[in-house]
Amino acid sequence: MRIAHCGLRFAVCGALAAVLALHVGARAQSLSYTKGQNIAPAYEGWEQATDGTKYFLFGYMNRNWEEEIDVPVGPENGFSIGGVDQGQPTHFLPRRNRFVFRVKVPPTFKEKDELIWTLTTHGKTEKAYATLRPDYIVDDVVKASETGALGAGTSSPEVRGNIPPTVHIEEVKARSVKVGEELTLVSEVKDDGIPKRRVPSRASLQRLQERAAADPALAAQVRNPGMQPPTRITVGKSVGLHVSWFLYRGPAGAKVTFDPPQVKAWEDTRAGANSPWAPAWTAPPIPADGKLPVKISFSEPGTYVLRCRADDGALFGDEEVTIVVTK
């Protein structure tokens, strides 16, 4: 009986330990961090241009909500073939960043071959493995869905006809300024107006107000859209043409200041964030001529690569400018 009792006790303890482990594991997965975590490189898929050229698409997941990490091109931020430098970022923004850059697929590359991006941050090394498997092929509808403009598996003739916006920087591609000195750059954006901004009609707003009059919980959501519960389990993104400037490559630890503050190019889903992934966010107006000036200053000397992104909420176009900063 004593042996049976001990066995029962150990079985119960084992079951409790298993439940506790599951609880701790689930809790750990739900934790969020401002800093100290590593970055996972991500292979997003591959696409084929109209001329038949194939490209691998990459992004990353910075597990921090605030920390931006710099990793120079080399053994800790490099590729397995074709040279370590394939145009990847050296400055990594917080959280999820999708379809950040693409790498031309070598003409001799076969479906069984792999291109590996290795990234080491905070002492942890992770790799992304790119292949030409057919199930990894990506088109514009997939991009719009993955970034949050569409629900999974949804599309329309309008969405399928969407053309990515374009951006042109009205300055020479290489400039030299001093630390702390302001540089003004002007971007010009153009878009086809697709997808259309979701603006509630007057009739729908009136119906919503009538329902809210009889429902205190709904009334609170009308007063504060940030209190609205999520309508989807995947990331959601507001559509509407907007422009974002951000640092793509630069000296480690350097800070770049943009005036006015820029719309975030990374998936900041927190309420009140200046981000198309944030609840109740709306795109700021674009001037009729599509031109937007920005003042930029730098904290450290060195060579910087800045990106300017024109984003319609579903697709985007990037343009880069290189700035040399001296003391």
Where are these regions (language model features)?
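Bacterial N-terminal signal peptides
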Residues: 11-23
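Exoplasmic/lumenal beta-rich domain surfaces
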Residues: 79, 198-297
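Short, solvent-exposed loop/turn segments at the edges of extracellular beta-sandwich modules
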Residues: 311-315
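Residue-level recognition of secondary-structure-to-loop junctions
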Residues: 48, 109, 286, 296-300
